[in-house]
Amino acid sequence: KIKKLQANSTVTNEEAMYLNLWQREIESIGDELIAANDIEYTNSKVQVMATIDSFGNLIKSEILISSGNTYVDKMAIDILEKAAPFAPFDPKMINEYGILEIIRDWNFTPR
């Protein structure tokens, strides 16, 4: 079973904790990659979907809505792939589904 979590989805406590950890990992890796590339970004927004299995493996990463900038889109996918694997699911989450699709808008702004 697959659970899709969008920005406006109602989530359980376990899912909220999982999303918080996931987001912190993404932001940490994103900050490192952006600093390492020393690129100044214009204001760009990209919508990504990360498909994660119950073990925390990233099984698919895709751009749902492009920023219009191929470099920004590629950076978003690179961040997802370098941040993986993520934490395994909480047992309550595993009881409900084996795959999680997280859909989020990511904003890239100049430093």
Predicted regions located by residue number:
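Intrinsic-disorder/low-complexity signature in envelope-associated proteins
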Residues: K1-E25, D31, A35-D38
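Conserved "boundary/linchpin" sites in short secondary-structure elements
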Residues: K1-Q6, R24-G30, D53-I65, I77-P88, ...
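Intrinsic-disorder/low-complexity, polar/charged segments
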Residues: T10-N13, N69, P91, R111
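Short, solvent-exposed loop/turn elements at beta->coil junctions and helix N-caps
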Residues: A36-I39, K92-I94
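Short, small/polar residue-rich loop motifs at catalytic or cofactor-binding pockets
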Residues: Y41-V46
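A short acidic/small-residue loop/turn micro-motif
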Residues: I65-Y71
